[in-house]
Amino acid sequence: MIYFSFRFLLCNAIICIFLGSLLGLKNLLQRQLSARMQYNLSIIFLAVLIVPFLPISSAPSSISWSHLLTASSSTNGDIQTTFLSGNGYNLDKINDFAVSVSTQIPTFIHTLLVFFWSIGIFIMFFLLYRSVRQVNALHSSALPLQNEELNALYIECLNEVNSKHTIPIYSTAFLKSPVLAGFLHPRIYLPIHLISDFNAGTISSTDIRYMLLHELQHYKHKDILIGYLINTVHVFYWFNPLIWYFLKRIRQERELACDSAVLQLLKETEYKSYGNTLINFAETIALSPFPLTMGISGNIKQLKGRILNIASFHQPTFKQKIRGYLIC
């Protein structure tokens, strides 16, 4: 633990270099990669962020990363672990360098760095815990959707996305836009004001359909799990502005990927209508107050990017899909 602070900072520097390379590569291949491929690349990079917390032995006679990973590979045949074991030498070299430099730094500096880092973690954990409590309170105050017409529309949307599970749908007075929330027991929540506007005829069933399809695509692609991972990364990397930018970009890519998934279900003549739904409800679907929810909401800048994505969207060809998979 004495040299952990320096090793962690060293790993952050290396991670930033890799992250800069990834962002540059994605910008270079932006036209070759679909929104979903861009998002998937970012998710894969999240695995790199656990490297500083993996156990590494500093003593030559102790078990090194390569030994641990090789043993793990021989036990469960995990391909990814085998790949990492091949880089064990480089990882140990980084560890040895961190140990040699950290021993030259006074102990109180290590202690001070860990102290401030821990304070930040405590604050971020508190904010994350508060978000979990908000989601729980949202569920406690919500009621099962009673509108028969909307329930029938929801069943149609489930069939459109070929969902194998019927996700419960609730109504609530504490939201401005529909959201998907709940890690173990996901649910979709519709704002009561949208239901009232639908009954009054000021919102069409088409608008509600697009919103429901958007939430169901979040569920289908396990975006809630990714959302929890993103918030966990925020906790431990609260001090790194490049990581914050990267996580913000993942959220933007998630919405672009979700929009593209919805558009793939629609006819080409419906693309404009879907974009109009985002524009017409831009004020209503402001940012959700709950960070752990998935919704169609976003700030004006994000909505502008999504509208441009919708305007330029076209169904990917077979060659484009193969090219994207090969790049990823």
Which role fits each region the language model picked out?
Residues 40-45, 231, 276, 326-328:
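Central hydrophobic cores of alpha-helical transmembrane segments
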Residues 83-84, 282-292:
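Extended, hydrophilic extramembrane loops/domains of integral membrane proteins
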Residues 20-24, 123-133, 237-241, 253, ...:
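Transmembrane alpha-helix boundary/anchor motif
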Residues 1-125, 140, 156-166:
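Hydrophobic membrane-embedded segments
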Residues 221-252, 271-281:
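Post-HEXXH active-site segment of zinc metalloproteases
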Residues 32, 36, 126-145, 244-250:
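Transmembrane-cytosolic junction motif
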Residues 138-222, 248-273, 297-315:
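Polar-ligand-bearing catalytic/cofactor-coordination segments
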Residues 2-5, 31, 92-130, 268, ...:
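Cytosolic-facing loops and C-terminal tails of multi-pass membrane proteins
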